[in-house]
Amino acid sequence: MENLNMDLLYMAAAVMMGLAAIGAAIGIGILGGKFLEGAARQPDLIPLLRTQFFIVMGLVDAIPMIAVGLGLYVMFAVA
């Protein structure tokens, strides 16, 4: 029974990290598409849009990093 609980713990950590990575990839893809739409619509605002794009992309990309940290914590510290 203990071995089954450990397996479920590892699977839960893997699902958490995987779903966070997939969600961030989708979010960055949508964000990049909207950046290109805005840059094509108003080329004079590209420097402002680029700055905002990189700030938001960093925030979106931080979510999977936090999920990886929590997943590794669950796998090695809790287990």
From Swiss-Prot:
Modified residues (N-formylmethionine): 1
InterPro entries, per database record: ATP_synth_csu_bac/chlpt (IPR005953), ATP_synth_F0_csu (IPR000454), ATP_synth_F0_csu_DDCD_BS (IPR020537), ATP_synth_F0_csu_sf (IPR038662), ATPase_proteolipid_c-like_dom (IPR002379), F/V-ATP_Csub_sf (IPR035921)
Site residues, Reversibly protonated during proton transport: 61
Segments on the Periplasmic face: 1-10, 74-79
Protein location: Cell inner membrane
Effect of residue 28 to V: In DC1; has a functional F0 as well as F1 part. However, the ATPase activity is inhibited
TM annotation in the entry: 11-31, 53-73
Record CDD domains: ATP-synt_Fo_c_ATPE
Effect of residue 23 to D: In uncE429; unable to assemble in the membrane
Coiled-coil regions, chain positions: none
Family matches, as Gene3D superfamilies: F1F0 ATP synthase subunit C
GO molecular-function term, one example from the UniProt record: proton-transporting ATPase activity, rotational mechanism
A Pfam family recorded for this sequence: ATP-synt_C
Membrane topology, record value: Multi-pass membrane protein
Entry GO CC: plasma membrane; proton-transporting ATP synthase complex; proton-transporting two-sector ATPase complex, proton-transporting domain
NCBIfam families the record matches: ATP_synt_c, PRK06876.1
Name by which UniProt lists this protein: ATP synthase subunit c
Name of the gene encoding the protein in the UniProt record: atpE
